UniProtKB/Swiss-Prot annotation:
Protein name (database record): Probable adenylate kinase 2, chloroplastic
Keywords: ATP-binding, Chloroplast, Kinase, Nucleotide-binding, Plastid, Transferase, Transit peptide
Originating species: Oryza sativa subsp. japonica (Rice)
Region entry LID, spans: 196-229
Record region (NMP): 103-132
Any one GO cellular component localisation term in the record: chloroplast
Length: 290
């Protein structure tokens, strides 16, 4: 019987001299950290592992994150005298670069038609035969430039600002172009372009006696000249245009680019395209080097 008990004792697993969890006052007290470490070491030796030679587990390296930084879209202002071809060039710029084309005049008419707060205020002045205050127009322009499409695609501000006070108001709002395109056309050519224009009252189409004459005699017989397309009126408008440009030079002199507008349409756009591409490249380089 004794030998049987001895054999049984020999087969029993060794008892580790470790602290057992105790309960005091209803609280569970785990073994001390030193005792827990002792248990782990004993377990490792039983499995034939030497703690001294055990390789530490290597931590994964931090993944390298590459973020592609994109330059802000182009912000362009364009100005030109009456009949300088500005409208045609705006369409070409918009088509190639996808910029949001914003004309202050069109914007004003749209706001009035929509009955917006700015439109209602502007209409009150126009009905009295007064100029719409800069404050109202600047606010319209600002709100349009802050729309998501203009922020995402970039913008092309057509014929605005026209005065020093308007430009300063935009500067105060931190609205500034990357490039200001100024179309330069000789006065005699501008006068010729304006004075030769004719309106078809039936279709609303604009013709030019020299550059785009009517298709037939029937159309030619009904063409009329608009009241402000006379030589006297156009010269007054040119004088106002040059005064406006002069007032803007001090603000935008570092971004103004003069483009000769007396060449063929495609040649004029080729020069504008070159300037816009250069401006976009500079923006990209600045972002890459930041």
């Amino acid at each position: 019987m004794a030998s049987s008990m001895a054999a049984t004792a020999t087969l029993s697993p060794p008892v580790l001299s470790a602290e057992r969890p105790t309960v005091r006052g209803g609280l569970f007290l785990p073994p001390s950290p030193a005792t827990s470490r002792s248990l782990r070491l004993q377990s490792a030796r039983r499995c034939g592992i030497s703690p001294a030679t055990r390789k530490p587990r290597s931590l994964p390296r931090a993944a390298k994150v590459v973020v592609a930084v994109k330059a802000d879209p182009l912000k362009v202002m364009i100005a030109g005298a009456p009949a300088s071809g500005k409208g045609t060039q705006c369409e070409l710029i918009k088509s190639k670069y996808g910029l949001v084309h914003i004309s202050a005049g069109d914007l004003l008419r749209a706001e009035i038609a929509a009955g917006s707060e700015n439109g209602k205020r502007a209409k009150e002045f126009m009905e009295k035969g007064q100029l719409v205050p800069d404050e109202i127009v600047v606010n319209m322009v600002k709100e349009r430039l802050l729309q998501p499409d203009a922020q995402e695609k970039g913008w092309l501000l057509d014929g605005y600002p026209r005065s020093y006070s308007q430009a300063m108001a935009l500067e105060t709002l931190n609205i500034r172009p990357d490039i200001f395109i100024l179309l330069d056309v000789p006065d005699e050519l501008l006068v010729e372009r304006v004075v030769g224009r004719r309106l078809d009252p039936v279709t609303g189409k604009i013709y030019h006696l020299k550059y785009s004459p009517p298709e037939n005699e029937e159309i030619a017989s009904r063409l009329t000249q608009r009241f402000d397309d006379t030589e006297e009126k156009v010269k007054l408008r040119l004088q106002t245009h040059y005064q406006n440009v002069e007032s803007l030079l001090s603000i935008y002199e570092d971004v103004i680019v003069e483009v000769k507008g007396d060449a063929l349409v495609d040649d004029v756009f080729a020069e504008i395209d070159k300037q816009l591409t250069s401006s976009l490249d500079k923006k990209t380089e600045m972002v890459a080097s930041a």
